[in-house]
Amino acid sequence: VVGEVDEAWRVNTLENIRLPVRLGQDVFSKGYLEQETIQQTEEAFLRFKHVADNYGVQRMRAVATSAAREASNGSLLIERVMSASGIEIEIISGEEEARLIHLAVVHALNLKNKRTMLIDIGGGSVEVTISTGQNIISTESYNMGTVRLLEKLDTRNNSKHPFGKLVREYAEAARYRIERDIGAEKIQVCAATGGNVEEIGRLRQKLFKGDSDRFVTLDELAELIARLDRLSYEERIRK
């Protein structure tokens, strides 16, 4: 993302680019990054560097999350990208990842004095943050991202176990920690982030003919899960 900050610290997005480099598909199944994947990452960062130079970017930050944290050759990825593009990647913790996401959501939504649960669903991990306004109460990082689960549960190789059932078992293992952090006080806002969440929003709009892809009710979410659970991996991709 390339942005411009004004005197009031408002951010105007100038360009938003997303390139598909699947680090997690290597790391969560093999424990390391293949040379081809590292090369794809180098090429992506060369593209980012070109865009940044065109805009005259003065400050830049690049961060990597769970896949780079866990890859046995994660340091090689950092070195290769730095050598190719001059961009230094910072490998951040799950807690720092959650903090940055919280900052972004607070900036985008009016969360003043509201007790909020933020759920970021990434490829390798899920971060759950409880906050009140701008103050973070607790943050937990769970190793149950979408790419990790697909690799571990072997969905693409026709696993005999229903995908939805196995995912629910993973989620149930984390449930008591989330309920502990929430406590007795009611959650007023639940906000989810990540590419998969955006797809859920678009799918909800398509199936239920809604006006917006930004809001999903609990009943709609339950129906979406039930429908997706009945589909094969290939059918989910086509959806």
Segments predicted by a language model, with ranges:
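Helical "lid/coupling" subdomains associated with nucleotide-phosphate turnover
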Residues: E4-E7, D26-R59, T65-R115, I130-K239
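Catalytic nucleophile loop
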Residues: A98, G123-G124
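Acidic, divalent-metal-coordinating active-site segment for phosphoryl/phosphodiester hydrolysis
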Residues: G124-I130
